[in-house]
């Protein structure tokens, strides 16, 4: 596709998520008076986000300009690309563009959240062209761990703005996983103005091991297992799940799934023909014990840390459905993120202690779903962009990707390292980063959207680490006396029976503070409560070196 004939004036590129982090992808591209959203993903909470279910990007800037939004363009069906779509559509109206599988998964998300809203869905593929007033938009097939992944190409009068989505190059894959390198080369020859590209594995040298080689080595490893085999992987890694199904069929083992997160997406993809499953291969998890141990494979799946958590429970004999037994073999088909490394190491120790054999996870038997250094350079060389923006990674990964782009020939001054909310402006002459819009995290707790802030998280940390200390007093303000109490209650702070002296001392301190407040000309309840918080906190810290949350409760008769 050649450049559009209309001369564009202004272009703005704004990351609202997916930079400085591996998740929550969302990038805004504005061409004159039209706005396009590239991916709308979520992030699963970090350890310190106590009680938070998911995190989505702050879209206040989009809401302020919602009349300009022409569509949400999705690269693939993983949660960090589509997980925020239903939350976005609750707040505005916009058509949604994606591959057949991606659109099906979005519809399922909307149904699961009981959002009954008429949405315009457009199924697109490698040959689709969407025409707008200022731009045309086309797509190209990429390889990721889920079928029908796409890159997005916004054609402007200056050249194409290409968003790769999450990708790798693997020419051993075919069908729904095959990359269309010919189409990419055509886009590169037509002229790429800006390349926005995946940085997740920008620090990993070389190439990923081809998936056909991975499957061969997995077969060799699994064939040596004499007992029950448990494979732990993410529910979203359809390539790995298909490989396990293939190997199980060759080894005459039945397969059972353990984990609720897989059910809906797997069943949707299965009905649409994305999985090749031999007849009678799958059995319910409740029937596993009906087969000899050397005739079954259990695939423990889930999102984020769920598969590892399930293994930990199984190792400790705390799982509701099944537990690790002597002679079991376990394979973790998971690429550990930084915050998961310690958890995985601890879980492996628990599994070994429970009698399991661990099949080593190495480059021969496991590959990332993101391109390594040489694959990233290959994309840059194919596209030959004038400007380059590394995204989808921690900041150090973005920096590593920027260095690769410079090595591949992109002028260093035309490489932009961006953070959430940064605005890259192009006015027809210069590309500059000189502006910022509102951005950040929206924390979702249950059905509450954005009503959990830093203060609430701080309080949850306090409760989790140091517990809670409640002082209850009933007052007779008319006669200026304590009618009942003080009564002290604590949870998660100290073992009451071993700390009776400390609690009695705290009661006396509360009595002293309240009686002093009752002697004032004007009784100030807020001041009495604050004095209780300050002085009790000081007393408890001096005795225990801990600071529980202090809650004074004062009632009147």
Curated annotation (Swiss-Prot):
Keywords: Cytoplasm, Endonuclease, Exonuclease, Hydrolase, Metal-binding, mRNA processing, Nuclease, RNA-binding, rRNA processing, Zinc. One of its GO terms (cellular component) is cytoplasm. Its main location: cytoplasm. It is found in: Cytoplasm. Its EC number is 3.1.-.-. Belongs to the metallo-beta-lactamase superfamily. RNA-metabolizing metallo-beta-lactamase-like family. Bacterial RNase J subfamily. This is Ribonuclease J 2. The lineage of its organism: Bacteria, Bacillati, Bacillota, Bacilli, Bacillales. The gene is rnj2.
């Amino acid at each position: 596709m050649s450049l559009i004939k209309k001369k564009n004036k202004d272009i703005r590129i704004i990351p609202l998520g997916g930079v400085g982090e591996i998740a929550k992808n969302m990038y805004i591209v504005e061409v004159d008076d039209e706005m396009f959203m590239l991916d709308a993903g979520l992030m699963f909470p970090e350890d310190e986000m106590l009680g938070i279910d998911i995190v989505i990007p702050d879209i206040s800037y989009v809401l302020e300009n919602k009349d300009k939004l022409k569509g949400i363009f999705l690269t693939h069906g993983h949660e960090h690309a589509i997980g925020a779509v239903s939350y976005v559509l609750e707040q505005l109206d916009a058509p949604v563009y994606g591959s057949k599988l991606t659109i099906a998964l979005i519809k399922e998300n909307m149904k699961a959240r009981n959002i009954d809203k008429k949405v315009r869905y457009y199924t697109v593929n490698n040959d689709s062209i969407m025409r707008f007033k200022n731009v045309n938009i086309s797509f190209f097939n990429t390889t990721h761990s889920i079928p029908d992944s796409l890159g997005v190409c916004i054609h402007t009068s200056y050249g194409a703005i290409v968003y790769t989505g999450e990708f790798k190059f693997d020419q051993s894959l075919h069908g729904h996983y095959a990359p269309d390198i010919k189409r990419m080369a055509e886009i590169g020859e037509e002229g790429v103005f800006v390349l926005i590209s995946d940085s997740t594995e920008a620090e990993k040298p070389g190439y990923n091991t081809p998936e056909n080689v991975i499957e061969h080595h997995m077969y060799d490893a699994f064939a040596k297992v004499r007992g029950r085999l448990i494979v732990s992987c993410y529910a979203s890694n359809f390539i790995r799940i298909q490989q396990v199904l293939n190997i199980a069929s060759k080894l005459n083992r039945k397969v059972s799934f353990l984990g609720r997160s897989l059910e809906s997406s797997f069943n949707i993809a299965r009905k649409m023909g994305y999985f090749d499953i031999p007849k009678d291969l799958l059995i319910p998890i409740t029937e596993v014990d009906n087969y000899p141990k050397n005739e079954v494979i259990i695939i423990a799946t889930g999102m984020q840390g769920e598969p590892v958590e399930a293994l930990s429970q199984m190792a400790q004999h705390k799982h509701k459905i099944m537990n690790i037994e002597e002679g079991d073999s376990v394979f973790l088909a998971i690429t550990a993120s930084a915050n998961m490394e310690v958890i995985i190491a601890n879980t492996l120790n628990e599994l070994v202690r429970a009698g399991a054999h661990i099949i080593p996870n190495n480059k021969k038997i496991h590959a990332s779903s993101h391109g390594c250094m040489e694959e990233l350079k290959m994309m840059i060389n194919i596209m030959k962009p004038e400007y380059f923006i590394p995204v989808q990674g921690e900041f150090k990964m973005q920096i590593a990707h920027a260095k690769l782009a410079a090595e591949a020939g992109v002028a260093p001054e035309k490489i932009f390292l961006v953070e959430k909310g940064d605005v890259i402006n192009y006015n027809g002459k210069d590309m500059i980063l000189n502006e910022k819009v509102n951005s950040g995290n929206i924390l979702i707790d249950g059905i509450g959207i954005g009503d959990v802030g830093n203060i609430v998280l701080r309080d949850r940390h306090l409760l989790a680490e140091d517990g809670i200390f409640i002082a209850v007093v009933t007052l007779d303000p008319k006669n200026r006396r304590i009618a009942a109490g003080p009564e002290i209650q604590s949870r998660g702070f100290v073992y009451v029976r071993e700390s009776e002296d400390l609690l009695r001392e705290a009661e006396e301190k509360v009595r002293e503070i309240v009686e002093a407040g009752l002697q004032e000309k004007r009784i100030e309840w807020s001041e009495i409560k604050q004095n209780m918080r300050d002085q009790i906190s000081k007393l408890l810290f001096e005795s225990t070196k801990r600071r529980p949350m202090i809650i004074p409760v004062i009632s009147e008769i």
